């Protein structure tokens, strides 16, 4: 049974078993107006996208450059009045640009597919449009999964049968900066992440580590570039 059939079966089972009602009672945000006959049986998907500039809370500095913004392109896929959101983020070292992402997304035609539950078919089609453009492809992928999750009324960890308490740890990156800024950044993230990634590569490496250690004993990963 492929993923498309699984999702349609899951959709019918979720609504038929009262899963949505139980989640609603638990206080989760659900699309209670979605009906079974809207799940994979009609309508067309509409994709829109636009560029925007993500403004960073702090200047982000590594050994070779600093930046205060990250260029992004937001993708929205609408189906039956429900919208899924995704984005392509293009930090300078990835080699993609707003222009390249916009050009790729302009080639994507989702209206040829009958519904968003055709995940495998849609993503295979998107991937076939270019051997590169991974950020642009990821934006469509994320928006599509967001849309399907909303139509099912459940987060993806539940759809996949995963335990959110076993989510692998990820890092928060602290860029090179003055001690007071590094201290502030560390305080902001210390209770939200299990590992800190620290950018090094200048003359203040020791000072960076000592400043972070004055705030927290969290494990530190070093990224010197």
Indicate residue ranges for each PLM-predicted region:
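N-terminal secretory signal peptides and thylakoid transit peptides that target proteins
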Residues: 1-14
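C-terminal segment of N-terminal export signals and the immediately downstream linker at the start
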Residues: 20-56
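A general lysine-centric signal
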Residues: 8, 137, 197-199
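Metal- or metallocofactor-binding catalytic centers and their adjacent structured scaffolds
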Residues: 39-44, 49, 65, 77-78, ...
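Short catalytic helix/loop segments, enriched in acidic residues and glycine
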Residues: 68-72
């Amino acid at each position: 049974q492929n993923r498309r059939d699984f999702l349609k079966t899951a959709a019918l089972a979720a609504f038929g078993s009262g899963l949505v009602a139980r989640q609603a009672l638990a206080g989760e945000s659900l699309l209670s107006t979605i009906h079974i006959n809207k799940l994979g049986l009609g309508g067309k998907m509409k994709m829109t996208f636009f560029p925007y500039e993500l403004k960073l809370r702090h200047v982000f500095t590594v050994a070779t450059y600093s930046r205060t913004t990250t260029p992004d392109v937001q993708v929205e896929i609408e189906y039956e009045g429900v919208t899924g959101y995704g984005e392509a983020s293009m930090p300078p070292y990835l080699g993609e640009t707003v222009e390249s992402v916009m050009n790729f997304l302009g080639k994507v035609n989702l209206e040829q597919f009958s519904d968003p539950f055709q995940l495998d078919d849609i993503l295979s089609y998107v991937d076939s449009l270019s051997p590169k453009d991974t950020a642009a492809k990821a934006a469509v992928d994320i928006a599509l999964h967001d849309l399907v999750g909303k139509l099912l009324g459940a987060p993806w960890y539940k759809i996949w049968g995963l335990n959110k308490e076993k989510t692998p740890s990820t890092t928060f990156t602290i860029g090179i900066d003055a001690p007071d800024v590094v201290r502030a950044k560390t305080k902001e993230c210390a209770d939200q992440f299990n590992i800190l990634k620290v950018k090094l590569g200048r003359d203040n490496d020791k000072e960076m580590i000592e400043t972070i250690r004055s705030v927290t004993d969290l494990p530190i990963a070093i990224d010197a570039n």
